[in-house]
From Swiss-Prot:
Signal peptide: none annotated. Coiled coil: none annotated. Pathway: Pyrimidine metabolism; UMP biosynthesis via de novo pathway; UMP from orotate: step 2/2. HAMAP family: OMPdecase_type2. This is Orotidine 5'-phosphate decarboxylase. It comes from Nocardioides sp. (strain ATCC BAA-499 / JS614). Its EC number is 4.1.1.23. It catalyses: orotidine 5'-phosphate + H(+) = UMP + CO2.
Length: 273
């Protein structure tokens, strides 16, 4: 079994670091001339996968936009996952789950067990019930060679009230975000060429005093239409092992499959130059 970190390292070398988010919200479906229903969802999502999945290292479906249509939406998500992986892309399912005990284990089984129809290469998780609450998901990821991306420094304006808070008993008065990165540093300590446990750090946070070098990947949402530039990525993440700038709107608003394909190929070339 090849760990997620090793597979991601190879995918970035082959295709480039760009991660494309698949976020079929109602406004975007309307822009495509599609109905805000399961049929519109399916047409949109599968056309995007066909256009870009053979050319990017990672696709990131946002589960909530599929879940809102109930079981039929989940069935579309299952097809998105399967077809993306068949095209050679790694699937990072954006679910941001976080719970304790048996519930945490159930989430792990749903998204990381290869026998599940929702099985993905990696998922996003929330550590704010305490990093140890993620232990069942961490161990399941290890067992199946999957990856995790842990929320650390998000770019939403509400994030700092939790993520910048100082933690009692941490040397130097470290922050919650810094503590999350320390945990990831330990999880990835022996991994080569790249750890499987990553962090979510917004491309638009401006600056940070936190050490982003932890031998694991960084998912950097906010790249492109949300304001993050290639210069921002290089300035903010220069010390990080592998950064995945994540773009959704810049790609999805293009609509034409050939234009989407050319855009992601060109962006990957620019990110690697």
């Amino acid at each position: 079994m090849i760990p997620f970190g090793s597979r991601l390292h190879a995918a970035i070398a082959d295709r480039g670091p760009l991660c494309v988010g698949i976020d079929p919200h109602a406004g975007l479906l309307s822009d495509w001339g599609l109905g805000d229903d399961v049929a519109g969802l399916e047409t949109f999502a599968l056309e995007v996968v066909e256009a870009i999945a053979p050319y990017v290292s990672v696709v990131k479906p946002q589960s909530a936009f599929f879940e809102r249509f109930g079981s039929r939406g989940i069935a579309v998500l299952e097809r998105v996952i399967a077809q993306s992986r068949a095209a050679g892309a790694l699937v990072l399912l954006d679910v941001k789950r976080g719970d304790i005990g048996s519930t945490s284990q159930a989430y792990a089984d749903a998204y990381l067990d290869p026998t599940s129809p929702l099985a993905s290469d990696a998922i996003t998780v929330s550590p704010f019930l305490g990093f140890g609450s993620l232990d069942p998901i961490v161990e399941t990821a290890r067992t199946h060679g999957a990856g995790l991306f842990v929320l650390a420094l998000t770019s939403n304006k509400e994030g700092p009230e939790v993520q910048h808070a100082r933690v009692d008993g941490v040397a130097g008065g470290g922050t919650v975000a810094g503590l999350m990165l320390d945990h990831l540093r330990r999880l990835n300590a022996e991994a080569s060429p790249l750890g499987s446990f990553g962090a979510v750090v917004g491309a638009t946070i401006g600056s940070t005093d936190e050490d982003l070098a932890f031998n694991g990947p960084v998912l950097a949402p906010g790249f492109g239409a949300q304001g993050g530039t290639i210069a921002d990525v290089r300035r903010l993440f220069g010390a990080a092992a592998a950064v995945l700038p994540s773009s959704s709107r810049d790609v999805l608003r293009l609509q034409d499959p050939d234009v989407m394909r050319d855009f992601v190929v060109r962006t990957n070339d620019e990110l690697r130059s």
